[in-house]
Amino acid sequence: MVGKHCILELYDCDKSKLDDEAFLRTTITTAAKRAGATLLNLITHRFEPQGVTGLALLAESHISIHTWPETGYAAVDVFTCGDHTMPEKACQHLRDELKAMNHALRSFLRETPAAVAELERTPECTPR
């Protein structure tokens, strides 16, 4: 297994929080910690007249969020690699902090391609 990928749809969120770039930066940072991930970099952008996009680069992969305050909606993506991370905890934190009244969470495992797994098991093979 490479890691776990969670796709989170948040509905009927607190509209003011969806448009608050500083709040979202803090919330994403805490979500990464709750997942047991290591935050390497965080970039956010606030759009006019409203909406924020945030991307957290993690040592283990990423967290992204795109908000539409006018409809109370946020699209969240959390992908973490390794057995020590818990992306669902990041999703739960984001859901709770944004006060989502409704949500949909889909998660699935990312698998190691067979050819890569074979190279990892064969020490004498070197990548080209």
Swiss-Prot record:
Subunit text: Heterotetramer of two alpha and two beta chains arranged as a dimer of alpha/beta heterodimers.
UniProt-recorded name of the protein: S-adenosylmethionine decarboxylase proenzyme
Function statement: Catalyzes the decarboxylation of S-adenosylmethionine to S-adenosylmethioninamine (dcAdoMet), the propylamine donor required for the synthesis of the polyamines spermine and spermidine from the diamine putrescine.
Residues the record lists as Pyruvic acid (Ser) modifications: S61
One GO molecular-function entry: adenosylmethionine decarboxylase activity
Gene name of the record: speH
Essential cofactor(s): pyruvate
Cofactor note: Binds 1 pyruvoyl group covalently per subunit.
EC annotation from Swiss-Prot or TrEMBL: 4.1.1.50
Alphabetized NCBIfam families for the sequence: SAM_DCase_Bsu
TM stretches of this protein: none
SUPFAM superfamilies from the UniProt entry: S-adenosylmethionine decarboxylase
Keywords, alphabetical: Autocatalytic cleavage, Decarboxylase, Lyase, Polyamine biosynthesis, Pyruvate, S-adenosyl-L-methionine, Schiff base, Spermidine biosynthesis, Zymogen
Sites marked Cleavage (non-hydrolytic): E60, S61
UniProt xrefs under Gene3D superfamilies: 3.30.160.750, S-adenosylmethionine decarboxylase domain (3.30.360.110)
